[in-house]
Amino acid sequence: PSASPAPGTAAPSTGGASASAAALRIGICQIVSHPSLDAIRQGFKDGMKAAGYAEGQAVTYDEQNPQGDQATLTSIAGTFKSQELDLVLAITTPAAQAMAQAITDRPIVFAGVTDPVSTKLVASWDAPGGNLTGTSDFPPIEAQLALVKRVAPAAKTVGMIYSSSEANASVQVDLAKAAAAKAGLTLVTKGIVNSSEVQQAAEALAADAFFVSNDNTVVSAIESVIQVAEQRKVPVIASDPDSLKRGATAAYAVDQYRMGYNAAKIAVRILAKGQKPAAIPVEK
């Protein structure tokens, strides 16, 4: 008889057998529901399937979503810690931070994290150094702000709403200020705590255009920004293609699905090849 995989490793599925004790168990934590993050999750699962890990056969998933609630997120991290999981996928910075705080003895692959170094998830981009690595959605903010001027050449000010409690969001505000200045724009900002404040924040910003970064709280309520923008007849520049379907004027975007797919490739390197997250560079 063939040997069973070692703990934390598994051979790809080649047949139609039902899930067995040899199947990998992966916990997935997605901070909130919106199309871009859904695309990351689907990309990951498709990437695993393409590598031979069919869901329900060679891998099973425990998928959790706290819908932005920090207490629920902490609880999910504790649950994952107590389970016999082979790997955790953390989608976005808050999810990765919660998982990293709770889980130190198993690999964590993140996706949709803007700057894992400044948020102290990894020691460096090239040598993470701990039990985390993954794929980053570090945004092309200069190109995004330049797009504002292309769409609205007469614009002088651009409004940006951000989650004041999320480290990634603060990083993006600083980058956006510099990029706006380079594009000949003045950035005006408004911080929020949750998605219910997005419309009020948009109404409070006197701006010739709105820029929505890949701030998950704001993106989850982008319709509120679009409503205010339409009333004022000003454009909304987004950072993800799905926001175009929801009414944004234009977008300069990172491919979220591909980010999840590539995170699966990293997971396979860890689970099938025995590589350590500490030595796998974070992918931009």
Q: Model-flagged regions — what are they?
A:
Residues 6-15, 19-284:
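Short hydrophobic alpha-helices and adjacent helix-cap/hinge residues
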